[in-house]
């Protein structure tokens, strides 16, 4: 008898252990309800699960990635900017002694002055490129219109020079007349070759004077001394 009582007492315990796995229906409403056995042992955590540290810090940032350093921005007073600009106008590439002298005058460090000169040179190059960019689309004829007119012809004259008049040679009257007409014709033809007809030169150019004519050497010594 005692053995049967023990078996009946153990039967509901076995049902209670499996009741946390399958839902039971409520007797009044018929809706499924789940009963949790408080006597069940708690779940064990595996030794390798969740053992690593969290990547995120309590402040919300990641531990593995360092924070970026914030740059210290230097502000210049109007007096300092004026001194730096005047020094930049004199020399765009100052040496170490010039930078140290400028640092004493402005109260800034030599490294700050060196960085300012680097930024100022980069700014000037950017301004020059922005000025030359519109001129790159112009044609050569349009670009020549920007040049002054005086550079087009540096050797031009304001007014044309007066025409040069031909004077007779001083030895033409002293020479005796030749009896033969062939010699006179040759002499006149020679003078025409050496003295071409003078035309008015174009404006801005001086005419080149012709060389002097050759004197005839067919004169007799007695007549030339008389």
UniProtKB/Swiss-Prot annotation:
Write one Gene Ontology MF term: sequence-specific double-stranded DNA binding
List keywords of the entry alphabetically: Disease variant, DNA-binding, Dwarfism, Homeobox, Nucleus
Q: Which GO terms describe its biological process?
A: apoptotic process; blood vessel development; cell migration; central nervous system development; dorsal/ventral pattern formation; hypophysis morphogenesis; hypothalamus cell differentiation; negative regulation of apoptotic process
Q: Which SUPFAM superfamilies match?
A: Homeodomain-like
Compositionally biased intervals (Basic and acidic residues): 1-12
In terms of InterPro entries, this protein maps to: HD, Homeobox_CS, Homeodomain-like_sf, HTH_motif, PROP1
Pfam families reported for this sequence? Homeodomain
Q: Which disease is it linked to?
A: Pituitary hormone deficiency, combined, 2: Combined pituitary hormone deficiency is defined as the impaired production of growth hormone and one or more of the other five anterior pituitary hormones. CPHD2 is characterized by pleiotropic deficiencies of growth hormone, thyroid-stimulating hormone, follicle-stimulating hormone, luteinizing hormone, prolactin and adrenocorticotropic hormone.
- UniProt cross-references to CDD domains, sorted A to Z: homeodomain
**Name of this protein:** Homeobox protein prophet of Pit-1
Mutagenesis / variant outcome for changing residue 88 to S? In CPHD2; impairs binding of the mutated protein to DNA target sequences
């Amino acid at each position: 008898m005692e053995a049967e009582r023990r078996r009946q007492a153990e039967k509901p315990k076995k049902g209670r252990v499996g009741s946390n796995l399958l839902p039971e229906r409520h007797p009044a409403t018929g809706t499924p309800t789940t009963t949790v056995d408080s006597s069940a042992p708690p779940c064990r955590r595996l030794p390798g699960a969740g053992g690593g540290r969290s990547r995120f810090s309590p402040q919300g940032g990641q531990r593995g990635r360092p924070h970026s350093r914030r740059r210290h921005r230097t502000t210049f007073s109007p007096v300092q900017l004026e001194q730096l600009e005047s020094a930049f106008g004199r020399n765009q590439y100052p040496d170490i002694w010039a930078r140290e002298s400028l640092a004493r005058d402005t109260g800034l460090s030599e490294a700050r002055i060196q960085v300012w000169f680097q930024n100022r040179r980069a700014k000037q190059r950017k301004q020059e490129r922005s000025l030359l960019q519109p001129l790159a689309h112009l044609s050569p004829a349009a670009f020549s219109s920007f040049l002054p007119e005086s550079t087009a012809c540096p050797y031009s004259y304001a007014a044309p020079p007066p025409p040069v008049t031909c004077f007779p040679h001083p030895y033409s009257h002293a020479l005796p007349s030749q009896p033969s007409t062939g010699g006179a014709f040759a002499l006149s033809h020679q003078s025409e070759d050496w003295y071409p007809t003078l035309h008015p030169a174009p404006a801005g150019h001086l005419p080149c004077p012709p060389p002097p004519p050759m004197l005839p050497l067919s004169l007799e010594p007695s007549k030339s001394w008389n």
